[in-house]
Structures are given as C-alpha cells and as structure tokens.
Amino acid sequence: MIIDAHMHYFKIEGFDELAKLAEHENSRWGWQEICEANQIVFSVAMGNSYDAPCRFGGVTPRLINLGGEPFCAQPYNQSDNVGYCLGVQSEEITPDNAEKTAMEFEYYLQRDSHCLGIKFYMGYQNVYLYDPRHEPLFELAKAYDVPVAMHSGETANHHGRLRYSHPLTVDEAACRHPDVRFVICHAGNPWIVDAFEVASKNENVFMDFSGLWEHRLTPEREEEIEDFQKYVRMWMNYHGIWDKIMYGSDWPLINIPDNIRNLGRIVPEKHWNEFYYDNALRVYSRIKVCVAEVFRDS
C-alpha cells in the first residue's frame, strides 16, 4: 500500500495540461483510477485554491477543489481518500493580521479531520520560513499536532527567489520550534545533500521525495536520470534516516507508475514499507483516522 505524501488536487487549466503530459487526467475520477491501479490508499494534497471565505479578518488559507467547487469542510466534498494541507500566503500576512490569520486556519483544523497540516510556499512567497509573521501558525501546528510542510528547492517559474526555498532555512525554524514537525518538500532538490543534513540533525524534520522528475518518463529519460538516482541513493544510504523519508509525486506533474518505479530504484527494497506508507502515517498523524474511515466504508 502507498500513501502519496505530496500531490495537488486543484482544478486549473495549467494542471490540466500537466496531467496530459503525464498521460493522466486532472479530475477527481482520474485520480481515483490512478489510486486503484497503483494501490494508493491515501493522498496528502497541498492547498492551492483561493476560494476560502474570510471569517475573522485574516489571510485565508489555500484549499483544494478538484473533488468539488467550491471546497466545503462540512460535509467534506472532496474524495474521502484525499486530505489536505492549508496553503499559506505569507506575503499577505502582517503583524496586524497574523493572529486573525491563525484563526482562519484554525477553523479548518478544528472541524475537519481531513485537514492534515500547514503548507508554506517559500520561494514563491518572498519570505523566510522562520519570519516572525509565521509564529502564530507554528503555535497552531503545535497545538493540533500537525506538521508544517515547506516548498524547498527549485521553483516552477523564473519569478521564484531561491534563497527563500533553500532547505537550510528549515534548520532555523526547526531549532526554534522543536515541538513542531517540519517536512522539507521535494527533498530540497537540487540541494538534496543539505536537506539530508537538516533532516539528520533535527529530530523534528522529515523529507518528501516528490517532484524529482516530470511528465511521462521515456526510456531515454530514465537512462538520463540514472546517475542522479545513484547520487540520491548514496546520500540516503550515508545518512540512513529511513524513518524520515516519504513517498510523494507532485501529481499532476508526473506519471504515477513511472514515479513509483523510479523512486523504488532509489530506496532499498527493505525500506519500502517505511518510505511508501509508514512514515507518512506517522508524520501526518491525522491520516490514521481518515484511512480507518476509508477502509470502513470500502
């Protein structure tokens, strides 16, 4: 069984096009077919949509909407086997609205077991993860025992500022907040060595291996990435933090069978259970309740 610890569940034309390049369909049913064909029992979607109503005068979280527009928490109108992280618009948070923003986020954490964590889009948002404006959200993550995930590494467009997305910035936040779990998304690629060091040093830091390649992988492309895979596996073996690495796809960016197969070439088979399932269940701890409900209803 597999838990996809990093994907997207967002209806937008750009994602529709990405799905086509990966030979998939960016739709609720398209994702369900993928899950059934590849033993994916649950998925963690990163919040992208901007349809959250403002209730407390703060900056609203980005949600998911591929399962139904607009998003609804009660009753939950997305797929039961898809949970989500609340996306943060860091540049809009100010000292005046930071506490009210936390109230906007807490609304979902209080009411929806599918709300699994908080996602920061560093690099796309020109703010460091450890900026004081984020403190109320870190306190919220601690109170509700949910992880903080951070976009790390390269950005999908040239507008991104890479200094904000470097995995070393997670070290600063993790040291200041030892009671909060942090996830370095995309393994910090291309700064994978740095990401491994941050996760190895800090007990509260984990990594997801999503978005390392894109589209459908041709035989020629798979041959081209062999050296990269060996490089990642070398550092994975060196650090041996098998309880800190999680499978992710960044769907609809990548063809799912291609992704599962190629990540399986990096992670030794004896650690597949941890990588593909166990670690995500522990890091995103609310998944346990959701998975139990999925199996009960199936």
Model-based region annotation:
Residues M1-F42, R233-M234, Y238-M246, P252-S298:
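Mid-to-C-terminal alpha-helical segments outside catalytic/metal-binding sites
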Residues I2-A5, V44-G47, C85-G87, K119, ...:
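Active-site neighborhood of phospho(di)ester-bond hydrolases with catalytic His/Asp-centered motifs
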Residues F10-E13, Y50-P53, E91-T94, Q125, ...:
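Active-site environment of divalent metal-dependent phosphoester hydrolases
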Residues E17-A22, W29-G58, N81-Q89, L116-G117, ...:
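Divalent metal-dependent hydrolysis catalytic cores, especially in the metallo-beta-lactamase
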Residues E25-Q32, L63-A73, E99-F105, H166-V170, ...:
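Alpha-helical scaffolding within the catalytic cores
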Residues C35, A73-N77, L109-Q110, A174-C175, ...:
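N-terminal cationic-hydrophobic initiation segments that often serve targeting/anchoring roles
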Residues A52-Y164:
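Active-site gating/metal-coordination segments in enzymes
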Residues C115-G117, Y130-M246:
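Catalytic pocket-lining loop regions of alpha/beta-barrel enzymes
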